[in-house]
UniProtKB/Swiss-Prot annotation:
Residues 388-403 have a biased composition (Polar residues). The lineage of its organism: Bacteria, Pseudomonadati, Pseudomonadota, Betaproteobacteria, Neisseriales. This is Membrane fusion protein MtrC. Keywords: Cell inner membrane, Cell membrane, Lipoprotein, Membrane, Palmitate, Signal. One of its GO terms (molecular function) is transmembrane transporter activity. It is a lipid-anchor. PANTHER family: ACRA/E-RELATED COMPONENT OF DRUG EFFLUX TRANSPORTER (PTHR30158), MULTIDRUG EFFLUX PUMP SUBUNIT ACRA-RELATED (PTHR30158:SF3). It comes from Neisseria gonorrhoeae. Residues 377-412 are annotated as: Disordered. It comes from the Bacteria.
């Protein structure tokens, strides 16, 4: 950024301004003794300032994470046979129930016809048993046949009824196997590379994965964090300091090249157990993937609001001189400039979040320090500074901006 490139110049200008502010009284006395008219004093230069007020700001942590599909399904064959045709395009989106492979179905078609023939035979046997029983019933009443013969006819009918039910079940089983010869998608999602080609022989019960389908909208992102930080996060949630409008913690995603994913995600849950070997807890968030930008397995940086800082101040980056001790220049009540040591917590777009060193209503100098230092003016004229369009549009996605931050008075 530009303010880093001119850091040495800013430091020199700040030192000059401080020295002039400290020596202005002595120089003014010397000028009076030399007979210099008061009207010859240099006019007060205009400096750009921002009047700061305390706010409640969520400090964001950046954690490593990995993207994971919402659902993943491996496609396998449930019946054996030779693959005759692949019915999908690799890498395409498929819907649940869509045909993916066709296995040679001739054997299963024959099995279904055989089961139907068995049903016809069983039904014919049942019809004969019904007719025999109908003839035997009046005969046994007249003692024309023995009771044993009648009981045998009853048993034959029941056996024929069971044979019909078995044949019906065989038809159903043969139909299931025939349907399974056409392998369909178990879930909707993007299907990857086919692991088999036409002509491959599959055996019944084979565990070979034919292809994998991944459901990628929304996507999961898994993050690990120390147990102590997660406990702190839970306290913040319990106090209501980090809840978003929908009652969930918002998370952002940043890629390796530094770009930030435009969609915000939401924290779903924290694993209830701590990894004994690392002392870490796994957190899971969900994020929309309507444009299919996110890919399963991709490593990302997760931006997550972790701590709500009360009485924090949002200060433009160019107003802060970074060093062993971070400082800003303040316009005091007498109209002069004075340095103030501050504590910078973290970056927020083109601003710094300052957690100590400032007070409500302080006028922090953003522009004009160099001019004031060169002119040797004892006083300056503060003017509210407005950022340029580029600076106003720069706050980082996934991090709360100053305009979104809640004033500390409202947070309480």
């Amino acid at each position: 950024m530009a303010f880093y490139a001119s850091k040495a110049m800013r430091a020199a200008a700040l030192a000059a301004a401080v020295a002039l502010a400290l020596s202005s009284c002595g120089k003014g006395g010397d000028a009076a003794q030399g007979g210099q008219p008061a009207g010859r004093e240099a006019p007060a230069p205009v400096v750009g300032v921002v009047t700061v007020h305390p706010q409640t700001v969520a400090l964001t942590v950046e954690l490593p994470g990995r993207l994971e599909s919402l659902r993943t399904a491996d496609v396998r064959a449930q019946v054996g046979g030779i693959i005759q045709k692949r019915l999908f395009q690799e890498g395409s989106y498929v819907r649940a129930g869509q045909p993916l492979y066709q296995i040679d179905s001739s054997t299963y078609e024959a099995g279904l016809e055989s089961a139907r023939a068995q049903l016809a035979t069983a039904q014919a046997t049942l019809a004969k048993a019904d007719a025999d029983l109908a003839r035997y019933k009046p005969l046994v009443s007249a003692d024309a046949i023995s009771k044993q013969e009648y009981d045998a006819a009853v048993t034959a009918k029941r056996s024929a009824e069971a044979s019909v039910k078995a044949a019906q079940a065989a038809i159903k089983s043969a139909g299931i196997n025939l349907n399974r010869s056409r392998i369909t998608a178990p879930i909707s999602g993007f299907i990857g590379q086919s692991k088999v080609s036409e002509g491959t022989l599959l055996n019944a019960g084979d565990t070979t994965v034919l292809a994998t389908i991944r459901q990628t909208n929304p996507m999961y992102v898994n993050v690990t964090q120390s147990a102590s930080e997660v406990m702190k996060l839970r306290r913040q949630i319990a106090e209501g300091k980090l809840l978003a409008a929908d009652g969930a913690i918002a998370v952002g995603i940043k890629f390796d090249d530094g770009t930030v994913y435009p969609e915000k995600g939401r924290l779903l849950f924290a694993d209830p157990t701590v990894d004994e070997s690392t002392g870490q807890i796994t957190l899971r968030a969900a994020v929309s993937n309507d444009q299919n930008i996110l890919m399963p397995g991709l490593y990302v940086r997760v931006l997550m609001d972790q701590v709500a800082a009360d009485n924090a101040f949002i200060v433009p980056q160019q107003a802060v001189t970074r060093g062993a001790k971070d400082t800003v220049m303040i316009v005091n009540a007498q109209g002069g400039m004075e340095p103030r040591e501050v504590t910078v917590a973290q970056q927020q777009g083109t601003n710094w979040i300052v957690t100590s060193g400032l007070k409500d209503g302080d006028k922090v100098v953003v522009e004009g320090i160099s001019i004031a230092g060169m002119t040797g003016a004892k006083k300056v004229t503060p003017k509210e500074w407005a950022p340029s369009e580029n600076q106003a549009a720069a706050p980082q996605a996934g991090v709360q901006t100053a305009s979104e931050a809640k004033p500390a008075s409202e947070a309480k």
